[in-house]
Swiss-Prot record:
Stretch forming the signal peptide: none
Pfam families: Sigma70_r2, Sigma70_r4_2
Disulfide bonds: none
Name this polypeptide is given: Probable RNA polymerase sigma factor HI_1459
One of the record's GO molecular function terms: sigma factor activity
UniProtKB keywords: DNA-binding, Sigma factor, Transcription, Transcription regulation
UniProt xrefs under InterPro entries: RNA_pol_sigma-24-rel, RNA_pol_sigma-70-like, RNA_pol_sigma-70_dom, RNA_pol_sigma70_ECF_CS, RNA_pol_sigma70_r2, RNA_pol_sigma70_r4_t2, RNA_pol_sigma_r2, RNA_pol_sigma_r3/r4-like
Motif (Polymerase core binding): 45-58
Gene Ontology BP term (one): regulation of DNA-templated transcription
Amino acid sequence: MSFISYISFKGIKMNVISDLELQQIRTQMLTFAQLQVNQADLAEDLVQEAFLSAFKNLANFKRQSAFKTWIFAILKNKIIDYLRQKGRFVLESELEDENTNNSFFDEKGHWKPEYHPSELQGEEETVYSDEFWLIFETCLNCLPAKQAKIFMMREFLELSSEEICQETHLTSSNLHTTLYRARLQLQNCLSKKL
């Protein structure tokens, strides 16, 4: 039974999402989960748990936000629960050294001239387009693993700086440096691809 059929079966009218859109959301959720847990099978399990939870709680979906926003919030909570259960967010052994593969900066931490970011230009609606999010995902995947995970913890999982520092054993200064570099690299990548 498809998700749309299931919704119809439950008597919930939701004609704003098709099976194709649902598959696209699922793919995005899987990518998001894989960035956090770094294991394809585990990411798949978390996405399935998020969908199962959504199925069980469809009657509680008040449509105050988009379906995608709602189900991503469920996934974020599942990931946070898993990571807290495991007692870690990022294992040092899973991370690349911050200086490894970081070709955007010189040894003093300054931008290399060829990679210095330009200002993002363009229409506001670019941020909301599917193309933007595909490019963003590509740029995010180009970040070193440590930067990508910490960026996702802060911006997508919305964890506080204190919580991230506690879980990753980073100092506040190192955290802010890592986030700053991640944002700059994302800005550089996006400015070249948009």
